[in-house]
Swiss-Prot record:
<dbReference type="InterPro" id="IPR035960">
    <property type="entry name" value="Secretoglobin_sf"/>
</dbReference>
<comment type="function">
    <text>May bind androgens and other steroids, may also bind estramustine, a chemotherapeutic agent used for prostate cancer. May be under transcriptional regulation of steroid hormones.</text>
</comment>
<protein>
    <recommendedName>
        <fullName>Secretoglobin family 1D member 1</fullName>
    </recommendedName>
</protein>
<feature type="signal peptide">
    <location>
        <begin position="1"/>
        <end position="21"/>
    </location>
</feature>
<comment type="subunit">
    <text>Heterodimer of a lipophilin A and a lipophilin C (mammaglobin B) monomer associated head to head.</text>
</comment>
<comment type="similarity">
    <text>Belongs to the secretoglobin family. Lipophilin subfamily.</text>
</comment>
<dbReference type="Pfam" id="PF01099">
    <property type="entry name" value="Uteroglobin"/>
</dbReference>
<dbReference type="InterPro" id="IPR016126">
    <property type="entry name" value="Secretoglobin"/>
</dbReference>
<dbReference type="GO" id="GO:0005615">
    <property type="term" value="C:extracellular space"/>
</dbReference>
<keyword id="KW-0964">Secreted</keyword>
<keyword id="KW-0732">Signal</keyword>
Amino acid sequence: MRLSVCLLLLTLALCCYRANAVVCQALGSEITGFLLAGKPVFKFQLAKFKAPLEAVAAKMEVKKCVDTMAYEKRVLITKTLGKIAEKCDR
């Protein structure tokens, strides 16, 4: 439960910052992939950011923890983040 709250707060901070309230499409798809995609698909998604290997490895390590959450809860988090992003885009 704590991880989902942290993820939600981080997304709110990134998506709804006053200087730029429009959610970047790449960020939205990355967060959705982080929560719902399988490891190979998510790793491919991360490749477009050209992040250092250490950063990718760290992200994949956190994804292991997220993947232990029930799929239904991850879908619920994704839907909630979608609603938040929708409000930020207005």
